[in-house]
UniProtKB/Swiss-Prot annotation:
Disulphide bridges, residue numbers: none
GO molecular function: 6-phosphogluconolactonase activity
Name of the featured protein: 6-phosphogluconolactonase
Keywords: Acetylation, Carbohydrate metabolism, Glucose metabolism, Hydrolase
Keyword Nucleus carried by entry: no
Enzyme class at the top of the EC tree: hydrolase
Stated family: Belongs to the cycloisomerase 2 family.
Gene name, Swiss-Prot/TrEMBL: pgl
Annotated Gene3D superfamilies: YVTN repeat-like/Quinoprotein amine dehydrogenase
NCBIfam families named in the record: PRK11028.1
InterPro entries in UniProt: 6-phosphogluconolactonase_YbhE (IPR022528), Cycloisomerase_2 (IPR050282), Lactonase_7-beta_prop (IPR019405), N2O_reductase_N (IPR011045), WD40/YVTN_repeat-like_dom_sf (IPR015943)
GO biological process, one term: glucose metabolic process
GO CC list: cytosol
Source species of the chain: Shigella sonnei (strain Ss046)
Length: 331
């Protein structure tokens, strides 16, 4: 398995393309100059395209991915109704979902043969919308509205329209600020990192009809932490055994172990990391974690070690200015 790591650096308007080898070392293979401040990125389900959101002219750009080395070639673009904060796709590669924090909306862009061709739906009134996360069964879109302490739930119709479910939302504790999410591989649990109190909620998906319950909330910060909470990102290993979340104020990654059924998180440790870690990701083998420091302008690679999933630093690399997003593609 070959793996390519993409790093988005909005301040220098670049995507750095790296080869990740089996020992966890990175080799730079391409630097792409992007026509705008590039932030969120996602790889298409068929691994043929990288979709990126840019500002200040709000667009989604599609880059064709070379199958041999992961190199990028511009392919298409489509306008967006707000500044892109987070970007994702459905599992069949029919739609791109874009959450906009500043516009307070989530939009759906239709794809034709992998290329974006236009917005088909927009839902407004999502104050602080920070991500859009399709459920493993491709039915439900989870959309955290950070400033409203709620996660809105939509059914995605065949033509890409978003229909509010019943119930239409679940709520967090006041002041939590739900931000980014991941799902357990067994499809029974979801995990949401809360920006404003640096906690992680565990949501049990009791059935496919919106019967959802928060079964655990865990503080992700050290006991002696007294500064402002500012959590950012969350990811889980492919085997579902280890979960990670980062905080930008403390510049650390919190390490969690996950119970076999996915219902319980246990805090295992803390990894000091790059200054202001805005984004990170786990590779497809589950062996490595790559994190970007928004203020350090570097990325670090860690090996995931042992039963606890603790992090052992493997290497550190300079990238563009203000790196914010990390995507790993296997090909």
């Amino acid at each position: 398995m070959k793996q390519t790591v993409y790093i988005a650096s909005p301040e220098s308007q670049q995507i750095h393309v790296w080869n990740l080898n089996h020992e966890g070392a990175l080799t730079l293979t391409q630097v792409v100059d992007v026509p705008g401040q590039v932030q969120p990125m996602v790889v298409s389900p068929d691994k043929r395209y990288l979709y990126v959101g840019v500002r200040p002219e709000f667009r989604v750009l599609a880059y064709r991915i070379a199958p041999d080395d992961g190199a990028l070639t511009f392919a298409a673009e489509s306008a967006l109704p707000g500044s892109p904060t987070h970007i994702s796709t459905d599992h069949q590669g029919q739609f791109v979902f874009v959450g906009s924090y500043n516009a307070g909306n989530v939009s759906v862009t239709r794809l034709e043969d992998g290329l974006p061709v236009g917005v088909v739906d927009v839902v407004e009134g999502l104050d602080g919308c920070h991500s859009a996360n399709i459920s493993p069964d491709n039915r439900t879109l989870w959309v955290p509205a950070l400033k409203q302490d709620r996660i809105c739930l939509f059914t995605v119709s065949d033509d890409g329209h978003l229909v509010a479910q019943d119930p239409a939302e679940v709520t967090t504790v006041e002041g939590a600020g739900p931000r980014h999410m991941v799902f357990h591989p067994n499809e029974q649990y979801a995990y949401c990192v809360n920006e404003l109190n640096s906690s992680v909620d565990v949501w049990e998906l009791k059935d496919p009809h919106g019967n959802i319950e928060c079964v655990q909330t865990l503080d992700m910060m050290p006991e002696n932490f007294s500064d402002t909470c500012w959590a950012a990102d969350i990811h889980i290993t492919p085997d579902g055994r280890h979960l990670y979340a980062c905080d930008r104020t403390a510049s650390l990654i919190t390490v969690f172990s996950v119970s076999e059924d996915g219902s319980v998180l246990s805090k295992e440790g803390f990894q000091p990391t790059e200054t202001q870690p805005r984004g990170f990701n786990v590779d497809h083998s589950g062996k490595y974690l790559i994190v970007a420091g928004q203020k350090s302008h570097h990325i670090s690679v860690y090996e995931i070690v042992g039963e606890q999933g603790l992090l052992h630093e493997k290497g550190r690399y300079a990238v563009g200015q203000g790196p914010m997003w990390v995507v790993v593609n296997a090909h």
